[in-house]
């Protein structure tokens, strides 16, 4: 059941979608404001912008106009949902199911010609929204996605001063100090150490019990042994509870393995605290002009970071900082819009899938 009051400015189509719970009043207000500021009179453009705002609430940073109708109808065809709705909402949903939607091809052409929407080649912040292939973004989120893709690719391409041979030698030395009998890294774990030691960004992916914490401890030990001048190490996670778990897990695992303690890694913070969150309107203390003072940054539960927060983190990472992202692909998604894809990093062999 929708609890939103339908805005007076809503067209019949937008009003029906709002009553059915597909759109919120805020979605309609945003789309109306953008169209008014950009002198856009096409109702299909206002519909697309309102649906793009809706997609943000659903966890996606973009709208695909070609598939949104099927997506919405599938979501509305939920027996559990229908059992909770009142008669007004049920009637509105029936109207949505019978509603005539814009023809996808014509809709795309209209969006391409809109004064409110930039294309992929336009300058940054030229217009409030942007159409990139079949994806319609609000400009901020398109820029964040571009920042993440560009910065991750750059970090993955940059090799560190540690060679493969040096990494292998140091790893053998570290394994000799481990006091657990018969301890031996498997092929995936060795690849994880090599990726983290020889690249400025690496991703350790795996579910519970795949040894992610053990690998973080060994990687940090290898980095410390390979570089006697290794400076500050930061441990971080999206939430305070996750950061505390990471700190405790690294400390206990390092002790159990008999690894040398790393005092610089004894503290853990949220990603917001790491970046120096200064409150609404003030942004972060650390950014591309004032970068983080760490040699290594480990981020646990990285799969829960939003695209926007990852963009801010990558902006604040300098050329000499190693970033180690740890995550479970089956974890809950970010509470904010967008999830980060690491697919393009696989070509650089910096994404390691750990298995039990």
PLM feature spans:
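Positively charged, low-complexity/disordered segments
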Residues: 348-356
């Amino acid at each position: 059941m929708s609890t939103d009051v339908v805005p007076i400015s809503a067209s019949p189509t937008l009003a029906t979608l709002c009553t059915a719970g597909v759109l919120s009043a805020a979605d309609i207000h945003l789309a109306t404001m953008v169209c008014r500021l950009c002198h856009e009179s096409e109702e299909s453009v206002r519909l697309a912008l309102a649906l793009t705002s809706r997609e943000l609430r659903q966890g996606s940073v973009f709208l695909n106009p070609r598939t949104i109708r099927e997506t919405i109808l599938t979501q509305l065809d939920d027996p559990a949902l229908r059992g909770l709705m009142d008669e007004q909402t049920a009637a509105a949903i029936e109207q949505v199911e019978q509603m005539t939607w814009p023809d996808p091809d014509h809709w795309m052409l209209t969006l391409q010609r809109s004064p409110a929407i930039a294309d992929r080649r336009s300058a940054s912040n030229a217009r409030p929204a942007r159409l990139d292939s079949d994806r319609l973004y609000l400009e901020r989120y398109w820029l964040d996605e571009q920042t993440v893709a560009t910065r991750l690719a750059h970090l993955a391409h940059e090799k560190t001063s540690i060679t493969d041979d040096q990494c292998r030698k140091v790893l053998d030395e570290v394994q000799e100090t481990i006091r657990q009998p018969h301890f031996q890294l498997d092929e995936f774990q060795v690849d994880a150490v090599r990726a983290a030691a020889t690249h400025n960004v690496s991703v350790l992916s795996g579910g519970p019990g795949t040894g992610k914490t053990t690998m973080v401890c060994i990687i940090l030990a290898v980095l410390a042994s390979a570089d006697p001048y290794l400076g500050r190490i930061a441990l971080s996670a999206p939430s305070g509870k996750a950061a505390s778990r990471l700190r405790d897990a690294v400390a206990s695992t390092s002790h159990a393995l008999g690894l040398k303690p790393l005092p610089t890694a004894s503290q853990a913070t949220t990603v917001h605290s790491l970046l120096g969150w200064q409150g609404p309107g003030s942004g972060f203390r650390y950014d591309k002009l004032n970068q983080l003072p760490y040699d290594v940054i480990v981020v646990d539960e990285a799969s829960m970071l939003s695209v926007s927060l990852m963009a801010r983190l990558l902006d604040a990472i300098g050329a000499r900082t190693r970033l180690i992202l740890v995550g479970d692909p089956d974890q809950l998604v970010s509470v904010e819009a967008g999830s980060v894809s690491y697919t393009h990093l696989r070509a650089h062999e910096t994404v390691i899938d750990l298995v039990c």
